[in-house]
Amino acid sequence: MKGKGLWTRDYTRITLASILSIIGGEAINLPVSLLVFDETKSTLLSALVMMCGFLPDLLLGVLVAPVIDRSRKKRWIVGMDALLLGVYLAMAAFTHIGPFHYGLYVAFTLVTATVSVFYRLAYSAWFPDLIPSGCEQQGYAVSGTLYPLISIVMSPVAAFLYTQISVPNMFLGVAALLALSIAVEAGIREDGAQSTGERYTLRKWRSDLAAGFQFIRREKGIRNIYTYMSFASASGESTAILIRAYFQTAPGLSVTMLGLMSSAEMIGRLISGAAQYRFTVPPKRRYGVTRFVYVFYQLMDMLLLFMPYGAMLANRFACGALGTLSATLRSTAVNSYLPADLRARVNALFDTMGACAMLLFELLAGVLGQALAYRTGVALISGLTLLAAVALILLPAKVNRPVYEATRG
């Protein structure tokens, strides 16, 4: 791929397939959550459905990652999309012939979350190979911009569709998008093969699994970066709970103002992604930029709810822009550093860590929200994450810097 521009046949196709998948996901996730609450009138039952989406991440990824690392990633991607297509067609049929059944949506969430584990690991191991050498930052900038852009457009569209289109037809529409995505993915030439053609045995699986753990024990820089990202992601999700509660209860604030603040963050992400597509940060500067962003981001989170509303908007815009910058630099560096035959295993191990951190931090947010003022809880969680940034990113510069400066040969 060396010497080519970013928009090769394979990169264009995987980007188009990603767009179709994101549109489908955004089109069905909100309506399903709205439907469950409308039918049950229970926040607890709605939350249980959401929790089912996290359960497969706790262990399944670690168990299947060695197999995915040895396999053709394209087959996994196309196969999982085909399986999801069948699930959506089945849901269209079930919802057409029968009334609402809570257990059906619990099963649907568990099945789609399980399939997503396989899909996500195969995608994260395959996608770096589809970016032309030398275009890594631009490639990750584009992929990192897709979700916020589509989310801005699809959130109101999905809410509108929920009121205008029957549930069976929504499932059929998403199935049609998946069928189109499969057709696009099937035309990608690079298949992500790592297999030697040998028979894969339980003994080799255990050996591959152990190799993943050994790599993480040996590579302190990778371990530090992924551990911090588990902290940061969990912190962001948990503080969002307290921020929503603050906007719902504080005088002079409203849910609409919270939505505008989220839009400011998304706009920052879009502008940052566009800038990174045009301007590349040299590898030698990635670590310094990342250190600054992590400290700045957590300080802004700590101060957010103590600011006047206009400053909150500026805060979220800046964090959106800088957050996308650091995420793109991290993805570029880490995927250049990781051996191709270990990507799924390493990502799976840290997905498990991230899922555990998410559950713990959301519990912490719930406890702090009951015991303290909401903005105090946000400041404490963000302060804890700032300490994690110092301990895991800033201080171990000797082992972290080589990861951030990595380039593909």
Where do the model's predicted regions map?
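A single, central transmembrane helix in multi-pass transporters
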Residues: I165-L172, A210-L270
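Helix-loop junctions on the cytosolic side of multi-pass membrane transporters
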Residues: G98, D129, F171-Y200, L394-T407
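Structural signal for membrane-spanning alpha-helices in multi-pass inner-membrane proteins
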Residues: S33, Y88-T95, A158, Y162, ...
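Substrate-agnostic recognition of the 12-TM MFS/MFS-like secondary transporter fold
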Residues: R13-N29, C52-I68, R72-L84, L104-Y162, ...
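C-terminal transmembrane bundle of multi-pass solute transporters/carriers
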Residues: L59-V62, R70, K74-W76, M80, ...
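Transmembrane alpha-helix termini and helix-breaking/packing motifs in multi-pass membrane transporters
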Residues: S33-D38, M91-H96, V153-G173, T249-P251, ...
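Small-residue hotspots at the loop-to-helix junctions and early N-terminal turns
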Residues: P31, T40-A47, A141, V255-S262, ...
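Juxtamembrane intracellular "pre-TM" segments in multi-pass secondary transporters
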Residues: M1-Y11, D191-Y226
